[in-house]
Amino acid sequence: MAEDTSTEKRYLPIGSVVQLTGGEKRVMIYGRRQRQVDSEVLWDYIGCLYPEGNLSEEYMYLFDNEQIETVYFLGFQDQEEFAFQQRLIDAG
């Protein structure tokens, strides 16, 4: 099998469940390419605790691909998701 050597950034689909490096709980992704309001920093993802879900702003986590240690579940993917993935990639 050929190794994927592309430098194109890929995003996990909504609903993916991941473990962040140094994290104690798993996180479920519910948004991508999120801008932090108070600093204008652009993050790859926003997530909430799994299995608890979105409890409050206090429990929202902004993070990048590089911070993901393990992917436990890959979210739903269909043609609409693949088209949106391409829009995210094209946006840089």
Predicted ranges, named:
Residues K25-R35:
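Short beta-strand-centered aromatic/proline hotspots
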Residues M1-I14:
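Mixed-charge, Lys/Arg-rich low-complexity intrinsically disordered regions
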Residues R35-Y45:
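Short, solvent-exposed secondary-structure boundary/capping segments
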Residues I29-G31, E40, Y59:
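Short, glycine/acidic-enriched capping/hinge loops at junctions between secondary-structure elements
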